[in-house]
Amino acid sequence: MGQKINPIGFRLGTTQGHHSLWFAQPKNYSEGLQEDKKIRTYIQNYVQKNMKTSSGVEGIARIEIQKRIDLIQIIIYMGFPKILIESRPRGIEELQMNLQKEFHSVNRKLNIAITRIEKPYGNPNILAEFIAGQLKNRVSFRKAMKKAIELTEQADTKGIQVQIAGRIDGKEIARVEWIREGRVPLQTIRAKIDYCCYTVRTIYGVLGIKIWIFIDGE
């Protein structure tokens, strides 16, 4: 059996960049990581609570955290920032204040910026949320996968692979189903491949969604 490595970690420093940019003393490193995890979870929960979308897609592609001695800069890359801004006009300021209180960053200023990504459905996280929403609404998994592939074709990607694992359609025996369109060269480090794994809770149990998107490169 081939041992599968995380495609993003495999390409760090070549086609992929880090999502956390800061330095710390070795003894404080774990604290910094935990803080990052809490910040990301807090932002995701806030967006989930305040976004009114019919599709159930939050649209967060990634959250970048840059830390300096006196400043924590958080950049949220979103596919549909307009929905968040329209549903809560002062949402960003509110989120900033809540985060500052939550993490007691008295000595450090906390700044949040939102960046819109041009082709939302070219991002695996947003696509996984879309598929999860479809599965929760009891849409057939094959239909959901095909619709996701159609959406990525509009985003000019070179290839996509979607995998769903678990008790699909409520069957008693768990199985893995996958579909691939175009090329997905996982062994080529120069190929820019975006990846995500996402867990969705349905009435039949938990399903795992994995998506690989080949953007460009080689």
UniProtKB/Swiss-Prot annotation:
Protein name: Small ribosomal subunit protein uS3c
Pfam families, sorted: Ribosomal_S3_C
Record-stated family: Belongs to the universal ribosomal protein uS3 family.
KH type-2 domain location: 47-118
Record-linked HAMAP family: Ribosomal_uS3_B
GO terms (BP aspect): translation
Molecular function terms, GO-annotated: rRNA binding; structural constituent of ribosome
Keywords carried by this UniProt record: Chloroplast, Plastid, Ribonucleoprotein, Ribosomal protein, RNA-binding, rRNA-binding
Gene3D superfamilies, per the entry: 3.30.300.20, Ribosomal protein S3, C-terminal domain
InterPro entries associated with the record: KH_dom-like_a/b, KH_dom_type_2, KH_sf_prok-type, Ribosomal_S3_C_sf, Ribosomal_uS3_bac-typ, Ribosomal_uS3_C, Ribosomal_uS3_CS
Cross-referenced CDD domains: KH-II_30S_S3
Location in the cell: Plastid, Chloroplast
Taxonomic lineage: Eukaryota, Viridiplantae, Streptophyta, Embryophyta, Tracheophyta
Record note on quaternary structure: Part of the 30S ribosomal subunit.
Domain of life per record: Eukaryota
Native organism: Lactuca sativa
GO cellular component, one term: chloroplast
